[in-house]
């Protein structure tokens, strides 16, 4: 390790010990390496023993900087790995850091765009509108249309910091996995690898631009969701330009009520937007925390969500959607055996799983949920309970489902903040049932035929020729099979003859040996010669 890496590693260990994060493992589970580290750095004591462990972890990550803050935010969504008293405080981590110099941001943009900003923009504000760990945002106007826009630029010094911290994270995860077998359940190496992919994706603003364009296209002319327009001509790996929007932050309940917003409809539309993305588009915004969601102040009686920051999105294939919809419907019908069978059929748990035991485990965990009214049941926690139970039966981590669960928890939490009486099941059930009708049954068959009709219309003129070629190939194949069969029969006959001759030869040789003992030397010699002759014939038969 370089001196810089050693210095950073010491800083990380120092913060961990000063916040008592070795308490994450009980004393009897501490491996030799962590115990030795704690004793050798005896001057580093827990400075916050009065605080709960979850709060100490949050404060430590906050002190370590932006890369670790975002890591903590990701861990807060992994409720399959961490209990609520750890995950809940991590959800409070704020990705806010001091802005860097506006002149430096401008220079960075000009380098990325290949010319002075004044060529394309006017009224560029050197004071950032917002600043986060990865990027910061400035406002300006397009010269050609006078449209207000925001320019998002990646921090110029962030990549080396991220690379260095990720390298240390990988090493620490590897050490933890090897030194502490009890910690392997938390899958430290896989968690860091997942975080690394997410973080590096966020460093490429072309991905975010493409995601925003796709999401905007999916909700063109929608009353439910508005996605600001992205200007691809001014967007690249380190800069993204998009339309500036004005709205009320979705967490500003007081502001929304003061504006006369229909809170019930707004909450229901949040659920509608989520399930539309998942089941209609198979493409969903996976970072719907309150900082990325605003409400259009116009037409408060018919409220519209505004989605920002499309850096993280999730996708589901048809099989995932089908099993997800069927799981929800089976769960709310309390058909736990069907839930268990679906997990096996989908390949989420091994095929040799005992269905009866799995069904019983699901029933124990999920049945108490129905003690509550349906309007109080959390979809997100339903998924969480199902996945946690399935993990005991060796369910592999499904990244797309982890993103879905995280997003569902966000949407559900926002919806119930806006309108506590929100009945998520009543709002979501029509989406699930309609999607199932479109996937199974006569309607699904008709839709499939419609979808494939252009392809078959294109191939229809070629059908007679293809049929003729297939028949010719079939005839040639039959002839070839006949030849192979005749050859096989001849070979078997030769082998049978060879075995017979070999057996006769062996018998004669044995007789020759017996005759030698009885002083019939001439007869013995003749018998031996005959036996060898039969062996030669058998060898020749095998060679053919």
From Swiss-Prot:
UniProt xrefs under InterPro entries: ABC1_dom (IPR004147), Kinase-like_dom_sf (IPR011009), UbiB (IPR010232), UbiB_bact (IPR045308), UbiB_kinase (IPR050154)
Record keywords: ATP-binding, Cell inner membrane, Cell membrane, Kinase, Membrane, Nucleotide-binding, Transferase, Transmembrane, Transmembrane helix, Ubiquinone biosynthesis
Domain Protein kinase residues, every copy: 123-501
Subcellular location: Cell inner membrane
One GO CC term on file: plasma membrane
Predominant location: membrane
Active-site residues from the entry: 287 (proton acceptor)
Enzyme Commission code: 2.7.-.-
Pathway where it operates: Cofactor biosynthesis; ubiquinone biosynthesis [regulation]
Gene Ontology MF terms: ATP binding; protein kinase activity
Bilayer topology annotation: Multi-pass membrane protein
Purpose: Is probably a protein kinase regulator of UbiI activity which is involved in aerobic coenzyme Q (ubiquinone) biosynthesis.
NCBIfam families membership: PRK04750.1 (NF003404), UbiB (TIGR01982)
Entry similarity comment: Belongs to the ABC1 family. UbiB subfamily.
Protein name per UniProt: Probable protein kinase UbiB
